[in-house]
């Protein structure tokens, strides 16, 4: 029986369509596989990039994770003067990084704090920070805490109560207006204070006056107020900002972190202990 010409034409069209569909079916997965491979390569690169942020900041190893915070902070007697703290009595192998004034406002330092998860404490002076509070808002958003370092960086010892109270409470009000917080910790400029300072600080809501045992100089060297000339668990380290010469804040922090690692220590959050 002969097939009508029209039927043969329809069969040819159907066969061609099937062949084209088969080719398309084979091509799509290949393209998908190629795309998946590229995505996997990008993911692997990103994983390596984010898994080792410490290398970008000049460290050969990651900082150890700090231990859980203590159940209780340093005791403070209600109604009495706040304690003056140079170092924290703890067996935890932690030291505490504190930064003074607020003169240096390097955006890369914000990146450093975020990527290394550094629980730093920033003691701010209003006249030094000036219009740069936005920088410290960014630092706070990545884990830094904000504390009080007076309005004008005046040496408080010997000043009358009213003057000292104005310096401390005035900065409390500024920080509350800027960040919605009332700092518990206060550092007197230059570390100098007297009984009047403690009374004024208590009246401004301060629960501890924070000094330091170790201080970092502009060249990256450490000096020690008392005790052995090496970092020990519980040490509070002061890192001034805005040094006229020497290393940047980031560079000094890297050197400090290397020394911390050398001593088998890590960085703790001061506010968890004091």
Where do the model's predicted regions map?
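Acidic-and-aromatic substrate-binding clefts and catalytic sites of carbohydrate-active enzymes
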Residues: 102-105, 123-133, 155-162, 187-193, ...
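His/Asp/Glu-enriched short active-site or ligand-binding loop at hydrolase and phosphoryl-transfer sites
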Residues: 192-231, 265-274
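C-terminal domain-boundary segment and adjacent tail
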Residues: 80-90, 129-130, 247-274
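Active-site beta->alpha N-cap acidic-glycine motif
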Residues: 57-155, 174
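CE4/NodB-like, metal-dependent polysaccharide N-deacetylase domain
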Residues: 114, 119, 145, 154, ...
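Bacterial signal peptide processing site
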Residues: 24-26
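C-terminal motif of bacterial Sec signal peptides marking the signal peptidase cleavage site
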Residues: 19-22
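Bacterial N-terminal signal peptides that target proteins for export
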Residues: 1-11
């Amino acid at each position: 029986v002969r097939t009508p010409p029209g039927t043969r034409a329809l069969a040819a069209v159907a066969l061609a369509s099937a062949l084209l569909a088969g080719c398309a079916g084979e091509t799509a997965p290949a393209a998908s596989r190629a795309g998946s491979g590229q995505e996997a390569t990008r993911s692997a690169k990103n994983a390596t990039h984010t898994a080792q942020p410490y290398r970008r900041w000049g460290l050969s190893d990651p900082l150890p994770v700090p231990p859980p915070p203590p159940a209780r902070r340093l005791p403070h007697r209600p109604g009495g003067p706040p304690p003056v703290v140079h170092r924290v009595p703890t067996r935890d192998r932690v030291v505490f990084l504190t930064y003074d004034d607020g003169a240096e406002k390097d955006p890369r330092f914000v990146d450093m704090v975020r990527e290394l998860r550094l629980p730093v404490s920033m003691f701010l002076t209003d006249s030094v920070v000036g219009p740069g509070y936005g920088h410290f808002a960014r630092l706070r958003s990545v884990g830094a805490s904000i504390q009080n370092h007076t309005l004008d960086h005046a040496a408080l010892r010997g000043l009358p109560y009213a003057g000292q109270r104005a310096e401390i409470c005035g900065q409390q009000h500024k920080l509350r207006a800027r960040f919605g917080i009332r700092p518990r910790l206060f550092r007197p400029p230059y570390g100098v204070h007297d009984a009047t300072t403690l009374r004024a600080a208590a009246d401004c809501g301060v629960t501890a006056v924070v000094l330091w045992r170790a201080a970092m100089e502009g060249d990256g060297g450490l000096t020690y107020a008392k005790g052995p000339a090496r970092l020990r668990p519980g040490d509070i380290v002061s890192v001034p900002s805005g040094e006229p010469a020497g290393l940047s804040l980031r560079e000094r922090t890297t050197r400090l972190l290397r020394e911390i690692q050398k001593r088998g220590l890590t960085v703790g959050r001061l506010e968890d202990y004091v």
